[in-house]
Swiss-Prot record:
Gene name per UniProt: prmA
Pfam families: PrmA (PF06325)
Chief location bin: cytoplasm
Residues where S-adenosyl-L-methionine binds: 145, 166, 188, 230
Record's subcellular location: Cytoplasm
The enzyme's E.C. designation: 2.1.1.-
PANTHER family reported for this sequence: ELECTRON TRANSFER FLAVOPROTEIN BETA SUBUNIT LYSINE METHYLTRANSFERASE (PTHR43648:SF1)
Organism, scientific name: Shewanella amazonensis (strain ATCC BAA-1098 / SB2B)
Entry annotated with the keyword Flavoprotein: no
Bilayer-crossing regions: none
NCBIfam families assigned to the protein according to its UniProt record, in alphabetical order: prmA
Keyword tRNA processing: no
EC category: transferase
Protein's name according to its UniProt entry: Ribosomal protein L11 methyltransferase
Listed GO CC annotations: cytosol
Length: 295
């Protein structure tokens, strides 16, 4: 069945209100897209992260009359004559198949591949992490995840313990285990992340070496030789005393989820505990690494 798609530009301030209005008018689904190919900005606590220029995309049944909806939008004081919109007919597709076809195996560094579970691995002799890409957590396609995976691939992890702080899908912890780490600990505030990490560990036969905790449940005195945290600048800054305490003297640290302009501030924050390296960059994003100073 075909659909009618309405696309309109909005500020992040008004996107949620427009979404609610369109749903009330009869839209069957709403999605948000980046209007200017810009990095998503970091939200305040409790806010939904959106782009400054957000495109609201609404789907309606094919026989739906959109003229009254457009008139309603034009009457809104924050849109009015400035309303920019586009209406087009969308043919129905097997969207699950379309989504699956968009994911391919990706190589990170020299040894590591991230492979969707429905694809054949390109190099059976490589270190292959089999993943089911999901909507909520890391799949390796984002520059910050890629930066962390490349860093892990560059290390000799044989026999080492690692902490994945803010583990999400568990992709970094699982990759570290497949690269030779003896044990990994994943920490996340989200129950769904814990479940996703457990599923991906089982898919890669490393579940017996991965421990997963909510922050309030992590063991007292937990420390590791390697810690990677791919979260956001705000949490990295606020949680710095907690994060540094998880790394053994001489241990290695990687921090990502940072925009380029945030790297210097976060590096300075951690320099009291770590000998920090120069940042690595990919697109608009950065990764910081360092070695824990002796106590």
């Amino acid at each position: 069945m075909p659909w009618i798609q309405l696309r309109l530009h909005s500020s992040s301030e008004h996107a949620d209100a427009i979404s609610d209005l369109l749903m009330d008018e009869g839209s069957v689904s709403i999605t948000f897209e980046d209007g200017k190919d810009q990095p998503i900005f970091e939200p305040k606590l409790g806010e939904t992260p959106l782009w400054n220029d957000t495109v609201v995309v609404a789907l309606f049944d094919a026989d739906f009359d959109l003229a009254p909806v457009v008139d309603m939008l034009k009457s809104l004081p924050f849109l009015g004559s400035e309303l920019k919109y586009k209406i087009e007919q969308i043919e129905d597709k097997d969207w699950v198949r379309e989504w699956m076809d968009s994911y391919h195996p990706i190589q990170f560094g020299k040894r590591l591949w991230i492979c969707p579970s429905w694809r054949e691995v390109p190099d059976p002799e490589a270190v292959n992490v089999i993943l089911d890409p999901g909507l909520a957590f890391g799949t390796g396609t984002h520059p910050t995840t890629a930066l962390c995976l490349e860093w892990l691939d560059s290390l000799d992890l044989a026999g080492k313990d690692i902490i994945d702080f803010g583990c999400g899908s568990g992709i970094l912890a699982v990759a570290a285990l497949k690269l030779g780490a003896a044990k990994a600990t994943g920490i996340d505030i989200d129950y769904q992340a814990i479940d996703a990490s457990r599923d991906n560990a089982q898919r890669n036969q490393v579940e017996d070496r991965l421990a997963l905790y909510l922050p309030e449940d992590q063991p007292a005195g937990l420390k590791a030789e390697v810690l990677v945290a791919n979260i956001l600048a705000g949490p990295l800054r606020e949680l710095a005393p907690l994060i540094q305490a998880l790394v053994q003297p001489g241990g290695k640290l990687a921090l990502s989820g940072l925009l380029k302009e945030q790297a210097a501030e976060i590096s300075e924050c951690y320099a009291q505990w770590f000998d920090m390296d120069q940042p690595a960059h990919k697109d608009d994003w950065s990764r910081l690494t360092g070695v824990r100073k002796s106590l």
